């Protein structure tokens, strides 16, 4: 079984990645040296744990956004996706095709004069095909 990472390791790792994301890599030894330069960590063991978790998080960040880490690159990407406006609406309301029954319902509600509504003949549902040569299914 794996070891449990403490809250200290997780929090400090996330903070270091947010501040020094451009310097961090997917290599443990490089991340350990960077941590030695940028942070004051009381013990070698704790520094190694933070470097290891930072490396783990960097690998996860490569695959996609990670919960709890806010990076400028990811923020910009998210904003770009949210601000996207399609050229043509997915919901077209130029012409709405309804059957006679729906048209009568709209008329009873006083909405028969709404533009773009046209009556269409309802489609007949296909009869179900008998399975297994037309015999009844087995009873267990």
UniProtKB/Swiss-Prot annotation:
> Which Pfam families does this entry report, sorted A to Z?
Ribosomal_S17e
> Known Gene3D superfamilies for this protein?
Ribosomal protein S17e-like
Asked whether the keyword Ribonucleoprotein is assigned, the reply is: yes
Q: InterPro entries of this UniProt entry?
A: Ribosomal_eS17, Ribosomal_eS17_CS, Ribosomal_eS17_sf
Biological process (GO), any one: translation
User: Carries keyword tRNA processing?
Assistant: no
Q: Any idea which GO molecular function terms this record carries?
A: mRNA binding; structural constituent of ribosome
Q: Which UniProt keywords apply?
A: Ribonucleoprotein, Ribosomal protein
Q: Which GO terms describe its cellular component?
A: cytosolic small ribosomal subunit; mitochondrion
Give the family per the record: Belongs to the eukaryotic ribosomal protein eS17 family.
Q: What is this protein called?
A: Small ribosomal subunit protein eS17y
Q: Which organism is it from?
A: Arabidopsis thaliana (Mouse-ear cress)
